[in-house]
Amino acid sequence: MKNSLVRGFTLIELMIVVGIVAILASIAYPAYTSSIIKGKRAEGRVALSELMQQQERFLTQRNTYLEFSNSGGVTVPATVPFKTFSGETLLGSAYLLSAGLCPGGPPAILLSECVQVIATPIKPDPAAGNLQLTSAGAKTCSTGTMDCWK
């Protein structure tokens, strides 16, 4: 008599495990990507706050804010004394930073009175778009929602 013992998984057992892993992955992946986007948004908010502090220092020294652009692949002049990206390096950054006049109607707003700093995401963020902060303290998003500042 030969006593053979067969060990292993059947195909149905393997398919059940694959199905369970697929269900877990479909739940975990959107939560993971959402937390990554929120983390990058936090990086943009911190960078805007730091840039606004630098702008206020510049205002006290020169009696005006500094206007510069860093979007659409435009190179920022070397004379800008501020960091124009959100991360430690440009390649590791989630946002490009720029500064300009505050939006507003008549009477005209001067650059010595108000500045708006803008963080433009390098990778699109449809929920928030651009993060914007003015020297008057107004926090806005280009999408119109305030979820980006939460």
Where on the chain are the PLM-derived regions?
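Flexible, active-site-adjacent loop/turn segments at secondary-structure boundaries
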Residues: 27, 34, 57, 63, ...
